[in-house]
Amino acid sequence: MARAHASSVINAPIEKVWNRIREYNGLADWHPGIAKSTIEGGKPSDQVGCVRALTLQDGGRIREQLLEMSDLGHHYSYAILEGPLPVANYRATLRLRRISDGNRTYAEWSATFDADPPEKQAEAEDFISNAVFQGGFDALKKHFGG
């Protein structure tokens, strides 16, 4: 089982960061790698089971299904159903935690998956951890002035 992980401190209160990332259909509003997002079938974007269709900046497409969302816990989990990444059985969680010192937010994004093909595991772990997860955190930090 392969793993990807990134974490970051964002200089904004957890409520503001959660408000920015909570909209499951809003990834294109804050992640630089995403050009467009739509929810399939007209379902509410916070309904567990809804599927978002993402168009990447390079034209690639990914379909992801919402598995869990918690406003109280400030996190959501999702699975990739299909896309260009060399992965299978992909499950990820984006989680925020309150930092009381300075009223900041600790953000953590992690995933487990099977590399497909297996020899692409290190490459997939690096790309997901750095380009996808850390790339999103860098954009959030810039948005919040960090």
Residue map of PLM features:
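Glycine-centered tight beta-turn/hairpin loop motif at sheet-sheet or coil-to-beta transitions
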Residues: 1, 57-59, 85-87
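Hydrophobic/aromatic beta-strand elements that line small-molecule binding cavities or substrate pockets
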Residues: 6-8, 62-68, 90-98
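Hydrophobic pocket/interface hotspot
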Residues: 17-21, 27, 52, 66, ...
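A short, structured loop/turn motif at beta-sheet edges
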Residues: 14-15, 68-73, 96-106
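A conserved amphipathic terminal alpha-helix motif
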Residues: 106, 112-146
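Hydrophobic ligand-binding cavity/cleft-lining segments
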Residues: 1-44
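Short beta-strand segments that buttress and anchor functional surface loops
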Residues: 50-57, 77-83
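Mid-chain, well-packed structural core segment of small domains
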Residues: 79-93
